[in-house]
């Protein structure tokens, strides 16, 4: 007895990794995600390593996790992996208060975002 195994969320030749609560807005994270969409994994890692964007560090960690999932959990060839999907969305927002003049205050919103990276094993062309 027990629970039935849930179906996979991606195809058999794909692997998935999700990064939640990445500090920064979804708009800024999407700029970095656009750099790697459709690229080979090795190429995408190099682009992220030399990017000046601060969020590139977090995206690189999520991409490395997706590659590790592909290699260890799904037995896919790491050299043939391509970034199929890099989707970005909003997560929670931290609310803080900033003291202003004349006894007033202003609300400061510190946003968090999430990223979902799917890597796919590309077939060899003969």
Curated annotation (Swiss-Prot):
Keyword Ribosomal protein tagged: yes
GO cellular component: cytosolic large ribosomal subunit
Family named by the database record: Belongs to the universal ribosomal protein uL22 family.
Complex formation: Part of the 50S ribosomal subunit.
Pfam families cross-referenced by the UniProt entry: Ribosomal_L22
Protein name: Large ribosomal subunit protein uL22
Function text: This protein binds specifically to 23S rRNA; its binding is stimulated by other ribosomal proteins, e.g. L4, L17, and L20. It is important during the early stages of 50S assembly. It makes multiple contacts with different domains of the 23S rRNA in the assembled 50S subunit and ribosome. The globular domain of the protein is located near the polypeptide exit tunnel on the outside of the subunit, while an extended beta-hairpin is found that lines the wall of the exit tunnel in the center of the 70S ribosome.
HAMAP family noted in UniProt: Ribosomal_uL22_B
Matches recorded under InterPro entries: Ribosomal_uL22, Ribosomal_uL22_bac/chlpt-type, Ribosomal_uL22_bac/org-type, Ribosomal_uL22_sf
A GO biological-process term: translation
Keywords tagged on the record: Ribonucleoprotein, Ribosomal protein, RNA-binding, rRNA-binding
Keyword set includes RNA-binding: yes
Organism: Sphingopyxis alaskensis (strain DSM 13593 / LMG 18877 / RB2256) (Sphingomonas alaskensis)
Sample GO molecular function, one term: rRNA binding
Name of the gene: rplV
Superkingdom, taxonomy of origin: Bacteria
